[in-house]
Amino acid sequence: MQRYLVGGAVRDALLGLPVKDRDWVVVGATPEQMLDQGYQQVGADFPVFLHPESKEEHALARTERKSGKGYTGFICDFSPDISLEDDLLRRDLTINAMAMDDDGNLVDPFNGRQDLEARILRHVSPAFTEDPLRVLRVARFASRYADLGFTVAPETLQLMQDIQASGELKALTAERVWQETVRALGQKQPRVYFQVLKDAHALQDIFPELNALFGVPQTPQYHPEVDTGLHSLMALEQACLLSEREEVRFAALIHDLGKGVTPQEEWPKHHNHEAVGVDLVKALTERVKAPKLFKELALMACQYHTHCHRALELRANTLVKLLQSCDAWRRPDRFELFLLACEADARGRTGWEQKPYPQADFLRGVLETCQQIQPQELVAQGYTGARLGEEIQRRRISAVKRFKQDNAPEAQEKGGEDVGLT
């Protein structure tokens, strides 16, 4: 039996990047031999073992044969006569189909190193099309290595389009879609993930609400980039500069879903798109089973981003209602994430990338002002029940009025009815 370091560890080592996880392939062994040497079996579908000391994963070399739809419809053969090249052949990309023996010798039957140096993401074999998950994986790799100049090979993109045309993407579970997506959101350039999905015609299947934004115009005065889909990707790009939080990036990306269903005769205006978008955001986040904070923040950004942009103009009572709607008193940390998503939206426009966004600091000040009203003090003064709530509200509004006079004295006030907070 012979073991080889494979996959991402070899790829990243050759790129000069830190190697986080090391996976091994074992050739010429049986499960019984692995157990006899002290390895612990952990794989259910095919034999994967943990090294008795390092606890690194060691998988028996295997081949996979398509037996049904989706990414789970495979029959595995892990007999001892499976060669290393047989195992590498089943992998998705050439840069992931390299191996290294214990002496550091590279095994590269599919020219992965050449593609690595050329910065190309290329499929190993036509069997690439047998696994629909690879569409998302390639998009994620494209986003992960975009800053190094990697692009998807045209012939690989064609196979991704073929997978989409086959309808196989519908076999992907929500969990796998979200797993790939949230990993992409954590990369330096997640915009590339969604762009590659669009180029592969897969965005319409995976995120149809987002795909619907492309080709929808906005008012050039406020959106020189015009296209709503492009604006959404630009907002995501700006969110990456403002925060490493995947929740902020996701919220910035899908805040304008309501514009995708605006009747064409109303273009380029999108009246009430914030409220219209709420159901679309709910549908998307529930379909992909996004975690609770992702869903909450995306809904807030969708429903209230216009209020945030116009914060300096809003009346004191409307500002207090906005903070109440965002549950800012009890969840100030989430409100801060909301402000970052709104700032990303404002800056995600051609020519606006470097412009200041005073609304965020203004609303931070409004929240801090309201937090100085202590309910305990009012209780001590005898306020209870409904009277207590009314007095807290009255004092918050009065305090915000004074704050506005000091910090936004020249802003033209607009009532809550103008932004849907009546």
Swiss-Prot record:
It catalyses: a tRNA precursor + 2 CTP + ATP = a tRNA with a 3' CCA end + 3 diphosphate; a tRNA with a 3' CCA end + 2 CTP + ATP = a tRNA with a 3' CCACCA end + 3 diphosphate. Its cofactor is Mg(2+); Ni(2+). Magnesium is required for nucleotidyltransferase activity. Nickel for phosphatase activity. Its EC number is 2.7.7.72, 3.1.3.-, 3.1.4.-. ATP binds at residues 8, 11, 91, 137, 140. Keywords: ATP-binding, Hydrolase, Magnesium, Metal-binding, Multifunctional enzyme, Nickel, Nucleotide-binding, Nucleotidyltransferase, RNA repair, RNA-binding, Transferase, tRNA processing. Residues 403-422 are annotated as: Disordered. The keyword Plastid does not apply. Disulfide bonds: none annotated. GO terms for molecular function: ATP binding; CCA tRNA nucleotidyltransferase activity; cyclic-nucleotide phosphodiesterase activity; magnesium ion binding; phosphatase activity; tRNA binding. CTP binds at residues 8, 11, 91, 137, 140. CDD domains: HDc, NT_ClassII-CCAase. Mg(2+) binds at residues 21, 23. The keyword Nucleotide-binding applies. Residues 228-329 form the HD domain. GO terms for biological process: RNA repair; tRNA 3'-terminal CCA addition. InterPro entries: CCA_bact (IPR012006), HD/PDEase_dom (IPR003607), HD_domain (IPR006674), NT_sf (IPR043519), PolA_pol_head_dom (IPR002646), PolyA_RNA-bd (IPR032828), tRNA_CCA-adding_enzyme (IPR050124). Comprises two domains: an N-terminal domain containing the nucleotidyltransferase activity and a C-terminal HD domain associated with both phosphodiesterase and phosphatase activities. Catalyzes the addition and repair of the essential 3'-terminal CCA sequence in tRNAs without using a nucleic acid template. Adds these three nucleotides in the order of C, C, and A to the tRNA nucleotide-73, using CTP and ATP as substrates and producing inorganic pyrophosphate. tRNA 3'-terminal CCA addition is required both for tRNA processing and repair. Also involved in tRNA surveillance by mediating tandem CCA addition to generate a CCACCA at the 3' terminus of unstable tRNAs. While stable tRNAs receive only 3'-terminal CCA, unstable tRNAs are marked with CCACCA and rapidly degraded. Belongs to the tRNA nucleotidyltransferase/poly(A) polymerase family. Bacterial CCA-adding enzyme type 1 subfamily. A single active site specifically recognizes both ATP and CTP and is responsible for their addition. Monomer. Can also form homodimers and oligomers. This is Multifunctional CCA protein. It comes from Hahella chejuensis (strain KCTC 2396).
